[in-house]
């Protein structure tokens, strides 16, 4: 990820990219490259990749996600390898469940796809501590991502472990496997430019390259976003929203784009960024126009930050990322379909793009025609980089209209096969389905249990003391979000005091004599709160969390302060319920049941209920409306942190999204934002593999701040409305997805300027002929295709574009 994507520290892990063959099956054994592209068994190849992170989904989801990616025209999948997930405690390894990285690669190979193994150790990725295991901090003398033996020894050991696992499974190309590239380090050039680190960084990055090449994997090694000080034995690549202007500083290296950001992550306190489909298509088309040969969508499927894996600060549990496949694995239309059409056109031009001669011709400012020629064939790109005007371009006697901020692709230099701004694919609006399960809500029988605070209010076993305020991550060894600080003083005066705490904690709860006297979340600069460990930067092992150093003061009404920072402090990490693993619902837990009411708005409370799994295969979510802040589990599986009470800022420009112009993931840009004034996240993914079929499922909540579980509901996410626009001569295809849902009605068939957006269109010039045609072809069907003809037009309609909306 880029610098803006991660807030604080360096990140660590392994990133893997998986590349699908353009033909069925894989069999590449010799991998090389030249200045134009990768060369696989002697053939130059275009690679179109997409990121899918295996721990952000489940093994049961992997085959379907990979299948959809391949059907979307990808010939690559990318993923990080997550060190702190695989080695949470030193020399204790986890390669089970959704951390079974070898199984994930085998699923990709089974789909007929190649793989690129990107080994960090740095990943960022909005992942807890950037993928670094926290125990690294305990190694004497360690400095992250600089030239020093403690860090390099740990990095080499983990890199060697991952390489060995891949070799043992015959995953490298020379073994008949899918891996055709490997990466060491990640985005190092973003963070390590401090003057005092230049020499150490230089030695470290060259050590990385040498260490990687000694692994003898038989494929080239890459470094992404490494434009400065590139070692001679690696290939550097580009990351960003746009990479058409980027070229390697060595002409022998092909132009490769390892992270094309399809959207953006979401913070708890911010609206959601939506990168327009037209803009992504524009960026990809421009990249290949300007000699690109490999590009990867980050993300193609974002998934979910289950458990405590969300990085910081403020990253939500959902890692949807506005990707072509949504958090649950559903197609996000039109993004998925429009890019699929682009991929098809690009792959049809593979030979001429990678072997042909080319010439760029400027047609004034911001308009460029690129013509590729090979033997007697030619292919052309025309781009219009103006963000405020359409243009007409005459090429070989034919005039072509280009909307602003768009690229047209002409595989024969005569006929436009694709324009990035003209979307023909349907738009799908997903909705929360009212189902029998949702109707169970009023019948949920809740039981509850107070969190036992006694161990933290007294100096019981497990506590330890220090005459200083300690750093939270080290003290908890990152095994819990919660750290208790306790001190005592003799108060002889009268009157009231204000407790002042300078902390990098995310939320603070204050107790006096065992009673909760207040809680506070502070997003302002007086308190720098964060939800999880930092995950971006250089020497971020030095960046503190918690009430480290303080000060902690009691301030009386006169302004006099008692500084408690150097008092004797007692510490204990975690919750009693965490130690007892209440979330596993073991026998012996003393749940309290109430026939009619349960305590609400009570901090530090556990709740439990049961529900039946919804029928079918639609995506399942739990709606936590009414709750405040905490953690949720289903059948012992952590859904992650929840915070539905945190409402995103309401700001000007929300919901306004003009695709034209440079996309920036900045709230200040006030462009392409949604969810303003709404909960940052209210729905939490429950993968089908978490659920028991035909048996009760247990939902357990730990509510830390006090909420009302009576409004909690289990829902399914399904296609609601499907819409499309097309000109005469085009075909319109509408589909209600792959789970047997059918089109129930046609709502709008307008051959004019339809007002509104998909799901709420108001036809401006209704066409009865078009309506009847779509009703006859579509109602009662899972999908339908209709040819748009002149007969659909109405006299007096201004626009020649048909807009249709149907309900699933």
Curated annotation (Swiss-Prot):
UniProt cross-references to Gene3D superfamilies, sorted A to Z: 2.60.120.740, Galactose-binding domain-like, Glycosidases
Family: Belongs to the glycosyl hydrolase 35 family.
Active site, per annotation: 187 (proton donor), 259 (nucleophile)
SUPFAM superfamilies named among the record's database cross-references: (Trans)glycosidases, Galactose-binding domain-like
GO molecular function: beta-galactosidase activity; carbohydrate binding
CDD domains the UniProt entry points to: Gal_Rha_Lectin_BGal (cd22842)
Enzyme class: hydrolase
Protein name (database record): Beta-galactosidase 14
Keywords, sorted A to Z: Apoplast, Glycoprotein, Glycosidase, Hydrolase, Secreted, Signal
One Pfam family, short name: GHD
Highest classification ranks of the organism: Eukaryota, Viridiplantae, Streptophyta, Embryophyta, Tracheophyta
Signal sequence interval, chain numbering: 1-28
Catalytic activity reported: Hydrolysis of terminal non-reducing beta-D-galactose residues in beta-D-galactosides
Biological process, per Gene Ontology: galactose catabolic process; plant-type cell wall modification
EC number(s) stated in the UniProt entry for this protein: 3.2.1.23
Ranges where the SUEL-type lectin domain occurs: 726-808
Transmembrane segments: none
Primary location: secreted
């Amino acid at each position: 990820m880029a610098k803006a994507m991660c807030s604080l520290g360096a990140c660590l892990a392994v990133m893997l990219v998986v590349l699908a063959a353009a033909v069925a099956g894989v069999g590449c054994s010799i991998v090389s490259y030249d200045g134009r592209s990768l060369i696989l068994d002697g053939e130059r190849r275009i690679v179109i990749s997409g990121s899918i992170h295996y721990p952000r989904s489940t093994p049961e989801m992997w085959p379907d996600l990979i299948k959809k990616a391949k059907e979307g025209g990808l010939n690559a999948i990318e993923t990080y390898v997550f060190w702190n997930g695989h080695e949470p405690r030193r020399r204790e390894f986890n390669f089970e469940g959704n951390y079974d990285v070898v199984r994930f690669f085998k699923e990709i190979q089974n789909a007929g796809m190649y793989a690129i193994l990107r080994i960090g150790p740095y990943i960022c990725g909005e992942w807890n501590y950037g993928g670094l295991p926290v125990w690294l901090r305990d190694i004497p003398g360690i400095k992250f991502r600089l030239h020093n033996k403690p860090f390099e020894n740990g990095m080499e050991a983990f890199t060697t472990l991952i390489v060995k696992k891949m070799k043992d499974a015959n995953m490298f190309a020379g073994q008949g496997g899918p891996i055709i590239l490997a990466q060491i380090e990640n985005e190092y050039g973003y963070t390590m430019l401090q003057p005092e680190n230049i020499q150490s960084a230089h030695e470290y990055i060259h050590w990385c390259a040498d260490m990687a090449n000694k692994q003898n994997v038989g494929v080239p090694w890459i470094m992404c976003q490494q434009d400065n000080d590139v070692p001679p034995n690696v290939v550097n690549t580009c990351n960003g929203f746009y990479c058409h202007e980027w070229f390697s500083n060595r002409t022998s290296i092909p132009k490769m784009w390892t992270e094309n950001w399809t959207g953006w992550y979401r913070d708890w306190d911010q609206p959601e960024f939506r990168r327009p489909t037209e803009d992504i298509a524009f960026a990809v088309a421009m990249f290949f126009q300007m000699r690109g040969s490999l590009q990867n969508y980050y993300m193609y499927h974002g998934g979910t930050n289950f458990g405590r894996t969300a990085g910081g600060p403020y990253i939500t549990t959902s890692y949807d990322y506005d990707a072509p496949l949504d958090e649950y694995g559903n197609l996000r239309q039109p993004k998925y379909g429009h890019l699929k059409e682009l991929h098809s056109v690009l792959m049809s031009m593979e030979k001429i793009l990678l072997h042909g001669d080319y010439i760029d011709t400027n047609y004034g400012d911001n308009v460029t025609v690129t013509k590729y020629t090979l033997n007697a064939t030619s292919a052309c790109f025309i781009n219009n980089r103006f963000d405020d005007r359409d243009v007409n371009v005459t090429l070989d006697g034919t005039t072509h209209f280009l909307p602003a901020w768009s690229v047209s692709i002409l595989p024969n230099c005569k006929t436009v096969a694709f324009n990035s701004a003209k979307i023909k694919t349907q738009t799908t609006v997903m909705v929360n389905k009212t189902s029998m399960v949702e109707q169970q809500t009023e019948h949920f029988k809740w039981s509850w249990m107070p969190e036992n605070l006694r161990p933290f209010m007294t100096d019981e076993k497990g506590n330890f003391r220090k005459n200083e305020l300690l750093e939270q991550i080290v003290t908890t060894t990152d095994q819990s979000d919660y750290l208790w600080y306790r001190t005592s003083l003799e108060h002889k005066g009268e009157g009231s005091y204000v407790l002042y705490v300078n902390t990098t904690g995310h939320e603070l709860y204050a107790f006096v004599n065992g009673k909760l006297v207040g809680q506070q979340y502070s997003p302002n600069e007086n308190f720098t709160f964060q939800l999880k460990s930092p995950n971006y930067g250089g020497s971020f092992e030095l960046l503190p969390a918690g009430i480290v150093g303080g000060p902690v003061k009691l301030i009386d009404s006169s302004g006099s302060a008692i500084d408690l920072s150097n008092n004797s402090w007692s510490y204990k990490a975690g919750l009693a319920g965490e130690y007892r693993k209440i979330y596993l619902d073991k026998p012996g837990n003393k749940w309290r049941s109430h026939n009619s009411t349960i305590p609400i708005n009570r901090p530090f409370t556990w709740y439990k209920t049961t529900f039946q799994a919804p029928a079918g295969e639609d995506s399942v979510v739990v709606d936590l409306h009414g709750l405040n802040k905490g953690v949720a589990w289903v059948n012992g599986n952590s859904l992650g942190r929840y915070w539905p009470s945190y409402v995103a800022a309401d700001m000007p420009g929300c919901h306004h999204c003009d695709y034209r112009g440079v996309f920036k993931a900045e709230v200040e840009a006030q462009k392409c934002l949604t969810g303003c004034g709404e909960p940052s996240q209210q729905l939490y993914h429950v993968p089908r593999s978490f659920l028991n079929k035909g048996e009760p499922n247990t939902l357990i909540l730990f509510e830390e701040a006090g909420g009302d579980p009576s409004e909690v509901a289990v829902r399914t996410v399904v296609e609601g409305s499907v819409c499309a626009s097309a000109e005469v001569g085009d075909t319109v295809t509408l589909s209600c997805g792959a789970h047997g849902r059918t089109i129930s009605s046609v709502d709008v068939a307008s051959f004019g300027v339809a007002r509104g957006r998909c799901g709420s269109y108001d036809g401006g010039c209704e066409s009865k002929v078009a309506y009847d045609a779509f009703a006859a072809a579509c109602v009662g069907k899972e999908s339908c295709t209709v040819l748009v003809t002149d007969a659909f037009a109405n006299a007096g309609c201004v626009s020649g574009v048909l807009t249709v909306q149907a309900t699933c």
